Amino acid sequence: MADSTLHQPAYPVRFVTSAALFDGHDAAINIMRRILQSQGAEVIHLGHNRAVHEVVAAAVEEDVQGVAVSSYQGGHVEYFEYLASALRDAGAGHVRVFGGGGGVIVPEEIERLARSGVRIFSPEDGQRLGLPGMINELIQTCDVDLTGERPAVEAVLAGERTALARVITCLQQDALPAADRDALLAAARDRTVPVLGITGTGGSGKSSLTDELVRRLRTDQQDKLRVAILAVDPTRRRGGGALLGDRIRMNSLDGTHVFFRSLATRGGHELPHDIDAVIAACKAAGYDLVILETPGIGQGDAAIVDHVDVAMYVMTPEFGAASQLEKIDMLDFADVVAINKFERRGGADAVRDVSRQLLRNREAFGADPADMPVFGTSAATFNDDGVTALYQHLLELLGARGLPVDEGVLPRVQTRVSTRFAQIIPTARVRYLAEIADTVRTYHARTRDQVAAAQRVQRLELVAAELPGDAAVADLLARARAELDPENAALLARWPEVAESYRGPEQVVRVRDREIRTTLRRESLSGSSIPRVALPRFTDHGELLRFLRSENLPGHFPFTAGVFPFKRDNEDPARMFAGEGDPFRTNRRFKVLSEHSEAKRLSTAFDSVTLYGRDPDERPDIYGKVGTSGVSIATVDDMKALYDGFDLTAPTTSVSMTINGPAPTILAFFLNTAIDQALDRFRAAEGREPTADEAADLRARTLATVRGTVQADILKEDQGQNTCIFSTEFSLRMMADIQEWFVRNKVRNFYSVSISGYHIAEAGANPISQLAFTLANGFTYVEAYLARGMHIDDFAPNLSFFFSNGMDPEYSVIGRVARRIWAIALRDKYGAAERSQKLKYHVQTSGRSLHAQEMNFNDIRTTLQALIAIYDNCNSLHTNAYDEAVTTPTEDSVRRALAIQLIINREWGLAMNENPLQGSFIIDELTDLAEEAVLTEFERISERGGVLGAMETGYQRGKIQDESMLYEHRKHDGSLPIIGVNTFRNPHGEPERTLELARATEREKQSQLDRVREFQRRHRTQAQAALARLEEVARTDENIFEVLMDAARVCSLQQVTETFFTVGGQYRRNV
């Protein structure tokens, strides 16, 4: 759509954008809010997982014309109808509601929601209008003047939020009558309301610090004070749009005690032109404190000082040389300075240097620099004592200026800087990714040198054979052999024996006193003898050594071709994802999926209520999602029903659980279920209760034998998937506690984390970024666990990986590149043993490549993706069902998806061979290209302070969003051909089809509500004691998971989640 045809708004158009409750799929809404901004809208972006009441509160306080919400997790009908109703009830019925959810929202539901006043965009709308066209419709529909309906001044003075919000709109547009304006100013003058100004450099964490200060004020003063926050962000000179990105960072806005308004500068430099009148309106509305936060400023900006009573300047330790402080204008005027992100290198030096600069600026030369109002804070650290010290100092200053404060409940702190922040990665280790890149490149450089040395040795051996007894030749040969490392000489010397062991009809290996026989050849219908592992035919020793060091056979370092010598004969890699409704329905689905397989490989999808650590509830925006797009699990009893009939300790049973934020609690439910199964079997067999020693032995044996994986990858959640619920710091502590508990209890066959690239890819990343970010996250866990004092070989075998497969060429080598980098780094960088060097990974075919148009074509895409995953020796595989673009898969579509794998593994002829990619020129080329691209990305992340440092600046999220934007644009303009979507479209249109939509039934939803309430009633007394103990331990350095294992027996999921919120803090969203 050309710029000349876009609607040019006549009025300031404002939108609230978000993803729905319990929905982390924010790639689409991020694209939409970016285009809204570019077309001139002011966007208040709330991010993912937003309840209806949060969206309504934002719409009212921000006085927007429109709300745009994406919903991909089901429950959309209930959510949008509840949203429209709640807006009307809040006096904001004029706000237009827009939504989208790809093919998940079917035409009948779109029509139903239209009758409720909700405009849903379908995939067909996207094809017809394109991205700019859809956004243009939003802008055009919402280009209305809100100032025509002005509230009475009495309504503002009475504290009505809708009235205050509209008055601010009128003030910004110079549309408030002079009499009303004067009345507000007069009312403001009659009240003593201090104004706290917060300004500072961009990226210093002003919003996070503001949120932490407000949270402390509410806790300390027991919600006796009302606070109005005005957050200013700049208007873009080109286009006039603005990203108003402060509200997304706030976790302290619940209830009616805090009013929050985002303001665009609209032509002003640092502040809107009528900011004083806006502040006065907040005072007149009865608020006790006004906080004004301005955008990031340069060294010479101090405009905020003229509008506030107390001015605070926020900066970080990275200001350069101390002489740069002399150029910062605000240091002449600030009442308080906060050095945020104090945990970074140079934090203490920054506090010292700024204190000395303030002393000079104030000409207080006789004073102690330590008495200057400079605080070292870490707003990202939950309950940081440096922030508390800052809060208590500000409270004194504001109290002196009229803020009616009580004594408060927070104990006084005796520090001015953070003392308790935890360094997850020690400062000395922050360059770990650059070191790994160097390790891998050094390995390959040595390979090139050794290839040349091997070739020289071979040539000289031939010469020596032709000239026996020649001393000069013998001397040259001896020197050449000395240049060949003994390890590499041994590889070449062993090769004939290794090759011979693969040429017979079977290979016999003795393990202790057991003999393992493996058939080496399979016969085709034509009588051809197909080798399970094909061998290279190199005669040149250099090329052979290059193969052995760069690839090698499956099961041999560097494991490029696979971590095991052969695939299991009795177990396909299929691991099918299932979960819908209540535990009983999903249990039945598991039994159907596994009935024809001796190995029971169960992969569990949880509903979004569970994914966000909540219990089922009647509230419409929750109720609609119970048991939808996954199974509802709220208690250990639910978990027992889910896996009833499966022996969780059988060597042929393996359970995968895709859950992240509340993963510790779900894992505790699962392990208790496995233990209770063992105890029940003992009771049934022996007819009595086990003794204490017998029970302990059964527990230990269960933990040692249970097989499976819990995803629990919190780093990728922050970067792409968005089911983080606790603060990142607390979540990482819990991950380390789980792994430490695994080590103590000898849990060797269960993966404590599935380091996942799949969701990074689903959020929009290309295959290189998916692989680089995922491996970088894996190495971050390695460094974090080493820093906790664990030994590499105690925890590395408990790490697994999870990748997406798509249509891009790099997906053909994603597994082999990952295995090679991991093996080289673990051996040569970390000194790990062979078991730790083996990277094992699960593959799921791409959900993003499933399209609602021409859905039958989806199985073709899935088949190709499954083929390359099997060729690359993935350790397990899930093939998506063709109808997942629209609904949770039906039994029929799941059967078809499983058949894809079965046909490849059992019918496809080339699958008789287990290393079909080796020897391909293009695969070799792609492997090297992808590996180098990953190593280069490691260096980029390292430059930003490693994975955690890069996350702090939003590097990974930004890159994923950019790559998602590129894909969507190319899909919509047709330059990326997608068959049946933007090319080769059905000339007769989409055939009418009646899809079976998989949804939880009313009976299942109500049953889950009844079950969790009954569980809580039954365990009320025990739960209170268990939660108190859990909170106590979480405040110390003890292992939380040890106590959680007990608490999980008597507490529901939400009870544990809320306890962890109290002691660990909530996740703070990023734009």
UniProtKB/Swiss-Prot annotation:
Region (Linker): 401-558
GO molecular function: cobalamin binding; GTP binding; GTPase activity; isobutyryl-CoA mutase activity; magnesium ion binding; methylmalonyl-CoA mutase activity; pivalyl-CoA mutase activity
Cofactor(s), by name: adenosylcob(III)alamin; Mg(2+)
Residue sites binding adenosylcob(III)alamin per the record: 25
A single BP term in Gene Ontology: acyl-CoA metabolic process
Enzyme nomenclature, EC number: 5.4.99.13, 3.6.5.-
Binding, Mg(2+) 1: 207, 246, 293
Ranges of residues in domain B12-binding: 12-149
Record keyword RNA-binding present: no
Pfam families reported for this sequence: B12-binding, MeaB, MM_CoA_mutase
InterPro entries in UniProt: Cbl-dep_enz_cat, Cobalamin-bd, Cobalamin-bd_sf, GTPase/Isobutyryl-CoA_mutase, IcmF, IcmF/GTPase_domain, MeMalonylCoA_mutase_a/b_cat, MMCoA_mutase_a_cat
Positions with a binding annotation for Mg(2+) 2: 232-233, 246, 293-294
Domain of life: Bacteria
Binding site for GTP: 203-208, 249, 340-343, 952, 1070
Catalytic activity: 2-methylpropanoyl-CoA = butanoyl-CoA; GTP + H2O = GDP + phosphate + H(+)
UniProt: substrate binding residues: 566, 601, 707, 751, 800, 835, 840
Residue ranges, annotated region (GTPase chaperone MeaI): 153-400
Keywords: Chaperone, Cobalamin, Cobalt, GTP-binding, Hydrolase, Isomerase, Magnesium, Metal-binding, Multifunctional enzyme, Nucleotide-binding
Entries under Gene3D superfamilies matching the protein: Cobalamin-binding domain, Methylmalonyl-CoA mutase, P-loop containing nucleotide triphosphate hydrolases
HAMAP family: IcmF
Free-text note on domains in this protein's UniProt record: Is composed of four functional domains: the N-terminal 5'-deoxyadenosylcobalamin binding region that is homologous to the small subunit of ICM (IcmB), a middle P-loop GTPase domain (MeaI) that likely acts as a chaperone for ICM, a structured linker region involved in dimer formation, and a C-terminal part that is homologous to the large substrate-binding subunit of ICM (IcmA).
Function: Catalyzes the reversible interconversion of isobutyryl-CoA and n-butyryl-CoA, using radical chemistry. Also exhibits GTPase activity, associated with its G-protein domain (MeaI) that functions as a chaperone that assists cofactor delivery and proper holo-enzyme assembly. Does not exhibit methylmalonyl-CoA mutase (MCM) activity.
Subunit structure, as described in the record: Homodimer.
Family: Belongs to the IcmF family.
Protein name, as recorded: Fused isobutyryl-CoA mutase
Organism: Nocardia farcinica (strain IFM 10152)
Gene: icmF
